Amino acid sequence: MGLQVKDESKRVLQFFLRYPMKPGQRNTIKLDIIDLSTASNQYSRQYLADIDRYAICQSQATMFSHKLVALMDRYERFGSIAGRDIYDIHYFFVNGFSYDSKVLSERTGLKASVYLEKLLTFIEKKVNMRNIDEDLNVLLPPEKFKAIRQSLKTEVLILLKDETNRLRGV
């Protein structure tokens, strides 16, 4: 396959692998190896077109659930906030993906409605423009970054409020 390790994390099992491709085309894949397994995780076999291979991957619902937990988990474990966690939450909600409340409950020990309200409060109090700017300005194309940076936090809060209201039957 000709994969080369372009970069890797010193703290977690994360690799950026470069593969041969024509100039101007995507040539890097991010590989996260998560050694945290929950009984509620769902997996399926997926075709990864960029590398012409199949892999066993988390379902979208499982992945979204872990993304919802990642923001506060990262803060509790490392004292840091990653703008990409906010962006990922936004992406999953806006694209109409569902999360798995069983995974949320297993990871947090809370009912989904309680956890999402806690997450909403956390984002309101802790996430600021600096968190978003420092992380996303290097991950997104400039036009996309400019378009989303001012509204990202507000939109995520609205999406979470809508979801907590839905869960409460409001």
Where are these regions (language model features)?
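Structured mid-to-C-terminal alpha-helical surface segments
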Residues: 1-170
